[in-house]
């Protein structure tokens, strides 16, 4: 059995670790609230752009943007959104498992895939599996900015517009609530028909017409690009909210486990100390009896 000094050292070490995980839990909780706010604030912009683009598309049915035209998929692009840091439970593992399954399905159909990595963990993973990475962006920090993402996204959008890929997929972790985050792999391009369709309420709300400058086609082309960029930004915002939630939960679990370990070590320490005292008393009594 370990000595009391060794056990005290272990207890001190676990206590120090618990202080770190507790601090990280509190930091993650603070960042999570800010990330959730950014996520909610990003939604109205994307929805407004979608409404305007849908109105223009329905008013000009003769115009078909490449983003709206489905093609036989022989080559595909995939934008993979992950975190830059670890210590967030199985967040990255789950979304990268979904990416692996999607890649296997596409490759099984004879589809060649080129990838864009957003986040260090995804970049490292794609490098390990030998995927073709055509663009990447890492170290976004706690506050993602669209201008940092546009360069990496544009590579995939240009590839689709030029016919180099026939579909683009988006993989990220969707924020459900603090305790639940769901890995997603969605088709980004071509845009699904329901993405640019209006409900009856929306048609009544947007029953008026626009004055197009310079013309409707140019406006629709620009809006659709902005809309797709907004969808990717929304995915990054959701992923960051998921990251902080998962990290807060993981650090809380680590703190709770450390507390349990400290309790167990304290019990062992007390038993060891009691045994040592009992032994000393026995030796004293034996010595006195011998005299």
Curated annotation (Swiss-Prot):
Keywords: ATP synthesis, Cell inner membrane, Cell membrane, CF(1), Hydrogen ion transport, Ion transport, Membrane, Transport. It is a peripheral membrane protein. It comes from the Bacteria. The keyword Transferase does not apply. One of its GO terms (cellular component) is plasma membrane. GO terms for biological process: proton motive force-driven plasma membrane ATP synthesis. It holds the Pfam family ATP-synt. Its main location: membrane. Produces ATP from ADP in the presence of a proton gradient across the membrane. The gamma chain is believed to be important in regulating ATPase activity and the flow of protons through the CF(0) complex. F-type ATPases have 2 components, CF(1) - the catalytic core - and CF(0) - the membrane proton channel. CF(1) has five subunits: alpha(3), beta(3), gamma(1), delta(1), epsilon(1). CF(0) has three main subunits: a, b and c. This is ATP synthase gamma chain. It comes from Cupriavidus metallidurans (strain ATCC 43123 / DSM 2839 / NBRC 102507 / CH34) (Ralstonia metallidurans).
């Amino acid at each position: 059995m370990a000595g009391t000094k060794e056990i005290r050292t272990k207890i001190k070490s676990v206590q120090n670790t618990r202080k770190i995980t507790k601090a990280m839990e509190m930091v993650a909780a603070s960042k999570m609230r800010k990330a959730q706010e950014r996520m909610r604030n990003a939604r109205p912009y994307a929805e407004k752009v979608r409404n305007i683009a849908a109105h223009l598309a329905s008013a000009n049915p003769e115009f078909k943007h490449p983003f709206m035209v489905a093609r036989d998929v022989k080559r595909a692009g995939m934008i993979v959104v992950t975190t830059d840091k670890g210590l967030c439970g199985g967040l990255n593992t789950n979304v990268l498992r979904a990416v692996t399954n999607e890649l296997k399905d596409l490759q099984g159909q004879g589809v060649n895939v080129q990838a864009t990595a957003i986040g260090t963990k995804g970049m490292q993973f794609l490098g390990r599996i030998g995927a073709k990475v055509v663009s990447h962006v890492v170290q976004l920090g706690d506050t993602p900015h669209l201008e940092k993402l546009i360069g990496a996204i544009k590579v995939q959008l240009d590839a689709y517009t030029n016919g180099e890929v026939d579909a683009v997929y988006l993989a990220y972790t969707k924020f459900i609530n603090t305790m639940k985050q769901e890995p997603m792999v969605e088709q980004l391009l071509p845009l699904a028909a329901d993405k640019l369709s209006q409900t009856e309420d929306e048609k009544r709300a947007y029953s008026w017409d626009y004055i197009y400058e310079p013309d409707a086609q140019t406006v629709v082309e620009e809006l659709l690009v902005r809309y797709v960029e907004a969808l990717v930004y929304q995915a990054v915002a959701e992923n960051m909210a998921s990251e902080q939630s998962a990290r807060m939960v993981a650090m809380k679990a680590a703190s709770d486990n450390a507390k349990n370990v400290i309790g167990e070590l304290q019990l062992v320490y007390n038993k060891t100390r009691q045994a040592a005292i009992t032994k000393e008393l026995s030796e004293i009594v034996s010595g006195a009896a011998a005299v």
